[in-house]
């Protein structure tokens, strides 16, 4: 779990996302509260439930980007799902309980990687012995002289192996065969049986190995993975992963506004109000059956987000509204925000294009006047047509760099300066003509 303070979390998010301080502060406090809760006495810890968050804001202002960056900072089981991919129980499609199953799978993977890192040193020793066994047939136990010779030879080969002198030599080695995932389609209500069958098929394939001819440097990497996997206790791993999900799990529900029931619609809403009702027990706290064991959702943090352009938060069913107590509104982006997005974040759009063209030997430089004009153009197109937020910058930048990108391979050694005149020449007609803007930008 991340031990970063809210200020440190916001600072990290600032490196990638411009503005939206209210949303950043809300998720930073929520993430820090996960750590604070774990410092409490066990009795009190059980009573402290997470305060779920609803982020409201137009498309392209940074809601999903906050989730992506938060996943890297959290150091905890994290899953981002689209609410529109789920249907209510009884209909064809994914049920909402699959969210918790996927979250548990990611926790098992995370825990396995952590445990394999801990036993990597021992795994390297065992992998080295297996390679030496493949290089040197074992001496017969009856002949002491041969044993001694073999031991000396083994040390010589061990030294060569560690120095990398044998990296390109090929050996035949038994490698654990990759497990084949088995997807079983089952009717609603039969998830437990499905999980048991999947576990059975996975157990059947665990002991299979495949003989391969590999270079020693490639074989060594695979053998380390094999040996580390053998050293990991699977039962302990599952227990730790489930505990990690229950205490620190985070679910990001994107596009939640798309499952709102709008007042003017009539008839069954298979993927709308029914999905909200199915989400209720997950958000409130229930027990979900997974192939790794039973998972309680009482202390999983849910962060929902939506644009709410065709609906409003009050269109969510009241019970679900009550379980998303923290509301954060994200601000629409201005021309000044666009300018900052082009220059300030790590690996900004301008940096990316400069680096891409440098691979062809072409030098690109963006002047401040050019960046100002570019930001203004993107903002104007958003105002005149559909407002898609920062995503408009990708469209405008691609159109601006179209000629340079196409000719770059033939113009190695040349330099281009992107100033206000260059931007005006390449974009002004498109920006001013509303019909062209709708189709091209």
Curated annotation (Swiss-Prot):
GO terms for cellular component: HslUV protease complex. Keywords: ATP-binding, Chaperone, Cytoplasm, Nucleotide-binding, Stress response. The keyword Nucleotide-binding applies. Its main location: cytoplasm. It is found in: Cytoplasm. One of its GO terms (molecular function) is ATP hydrolysis activity. CDD domains: RecA-like_HslU. It comes from the Bacteria. NCBIfam families: hslU (TIGR00390), PRK05201.1 (NF003544). Belongs to the ClpX chaperone family. HslU subfamily. PANTHER family: ATP-DEPENDENT CLP PROTEASE ATP-BINDING SUBUNIT CLPX-LIKE, MITOCHONDRIAL-RELATED, ATP-DEPENDENT PROTEASE ATPASE SUBUNIT HSLU. A double ring-shaped homohexamer of HslV is capped on each side by a ring-shaped HslU homohexamer. The assembly of the HslU/HslV complex is dependent on binding of ATP. ATPase subunit of a proteasome-like degradation complex; this subunit has chaperone activity. The binding of ATP and its subsequent hydrolysis by HslU are essential for unfolding of protein substrates subsequently hydrolyzed by HslV. HslU recognizes the N-terminal part of its protein substrates and unfolds these before they are guided to HslV for hydrolysis. This is ATP-dependent protease ATPase subunit HslU.
